[in-house]
Amino acid sequence: MKKENAIRYYRKFSGADAYILGFVYKHDLYCITVDEIMPRFMRVEKSSSKKGGHEKLQFRLNNALKEQLIRKGAEKIGTETNLLEIPGNKGVSFERMIYRMNGQEPRPKDSIRFDKGGDININGIEYQIKLDGAQIVEFRTLNKIQKERKNAWQTDYRMVL
């Protein structure tokens, strides 16, 4: 699957209304809310052979993109050290920080697949939370959802006939 197709399917299937993106720049932690994750923020990578070696979309920001997001309104919410103070990997720590900032209790890890909803609901808006370096989606997951939806549509169509 090409990057463009993977992005198109991800956007089509996503249960999120918007995204909270986080990144570390010069040891400071920033976050910004966006409607879509821009293609230039994503790279196609392969997971390790230990994890199956599957292709995936990965959220990656270089310093120029981080500087651009800061100019566009990313706000400093802490430091890189703050991420390390919270148990779990940096991505989980970032999610927990976002939950706490919004007065909510964190959900269990990976409790909802990305096409079913966001990571957090704030004022009725479902947000996916991603820290720089996070996996966005594996291509095989996109293929699985595509098959599920195709089968559901065929079942619904047969019921109409």
What is each PLM-predicted segment?
Residues 24, 32-77:
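Intrinsically disordered, low-complexity terminal regions enriched in charged/polar residues
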Residues 1, 113-126:
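Short acidic loop-to-beta-strand element that houses the catalytic metal-binding Asp/Glu
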Residues 30-34, 138-139:
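A short secondary-structure junction signal
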Residues 2-23, 85, 104, 129-161:
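Catalytic cores of nucleic-acid endonucleases
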Residues 20-21, 31-33, 121, 126-128:
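A structural signal for short, well-ordered beta-strand segments and their strand-loop junctions
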Residues 26-28, 63-114, 150-152:
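Acidic-basic catalytic patches of nuclease active cores, encompassing PD-(D/E)XK
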